Amino acid sequence: VATIRDVAKLAGVSVATISRFLNKNGYVNEDTKLKVEQAIKTLQYEPNAIARGLAGRKTGTIALIFPDITNPFFAELARAVEDVARMYGYTVILCNSDNQADKEQTYIKVLKQRYVDGILFASYNLRSDDVEALKNEKIPLVMLDRAPRDASCSVVSSKHLEGAQMAVQHLMDVGCKKIAHIYGPQETVTGRERLIGYEQSVKHLPWYSPSLVEPGYFRVDGGMAAVENLMQRHPDIDGIFAGNDTMALGALKKLQRMGLHVPDQVALCGFDGIDLTLIVEPEITTVSQPIYDMGMLSTRLLIKKIEGDIKEEQTHLFDVKLITRGSTERKRNDE
C-alpha cells in the first residue's frame, strides 16, 4: 500500500507539500499540483488513515454502516450509537448499504478519504480480508451484531444460537408437532447461528426434514414467500420460528391471508424484539435482543479504541430473552 512518503518521493516534493495539496491548506503551484496528481495516479494512492495519522489530528467523526435502514432493528441501533457518540463529542455518519457489497465498498473508500476516526459495521457483506485491510490502515473498527468468519476484530453481539433454541423449545412447549424455520442470509453469523440452533433442536425428532427450512432474507416479503413455499410442501406445519421479527411480520401476514389462525393452527415466534411486533394482532412472540444496549456498548468500545484506551480486540455477547405474546398463546385442550 502506497504511503504519503511514497507519493512525495515520486513527485519530488516534501511530505508537507503533499499534505497541503491533500488538505487544500496552503499554496501549491500548478506545476507541483500536476506532479502530485500524476504520482497519486501512478501509485494508486488513496488519502486515508495513514495520512490522517501523519497529520496528527482527529475529526471527531465516526461512521455506522448498516444494511437496511427500513429494518427497525437497525434504526434502534443507530439511535443508541448517536446518543453515545454525542455524549463523547463525536458526530455519526450513517451509511445505508441496502445490503449491496459494491455500495458498502464505496462507503468504505469515501470514509477513508474523509478521515473518519473509526467505523462501526453491522454488515452482511464485509469479508475477513476487508477487516484486515482496514486494520492494516490503522482504522479502528467494531463489528456490531455480526462479523465475517475467521475475522480478527472486536465484536458486540448476542447469543443467537441459544436464542434460537429457546424459540424452538417454546414452540414445542405450547404443543407444536411440526416446526418450520425461516432463515436469514447464511453469510451472516445471525442467520447462520439461528439456523444451527433450530437444527440442533429438531434434527433428532421423527418429523424433521431439511425441507422444513426456507430462506426469508431478513425481509417482510421474504417471510411471506417462505410461508407460502413451506405450507405447500408441508400443509401440516403447526409452528414457525422466523429468524428475525421482520420475517415474522411477513409470515403472520401470509398465514392470515391463507386463512390460517395464529396461534391455534400455526404458532409463530420471531427474533430481535422490535416494537413493530407489538402493533399487529396477535402480538408476536419474540426472542428479544438488548438492541439499544448493544449499540451503546459498541460505540463506547469504538471510542476507546480511537482514543487509545484499549489495544486488544474484544468480544461481548449479550444474553437474549424470550418474550411470549399472543402468537404462541394457544388455548389449552381442556378449556
Task: Please name every model-derived segment.
Residues A51, Q105-I108, V131, V168, ...:
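Short hydrophobic/charged patches on amphipathic alpha-helices used for structural packing
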Residues V1, T42, A80-Y88, N136-M143, ...:
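Bacterial carbohydrate/catabolite-sensing allosteric modules
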Residues V1-G60, E329-R332:
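N-terminal helix-turn-helix DNA-binding module of bacterial transcription factors
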Residues R127-K135:
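Active-site-adjacent beta->alpha loops and helix N-cap segments on the catalytic face
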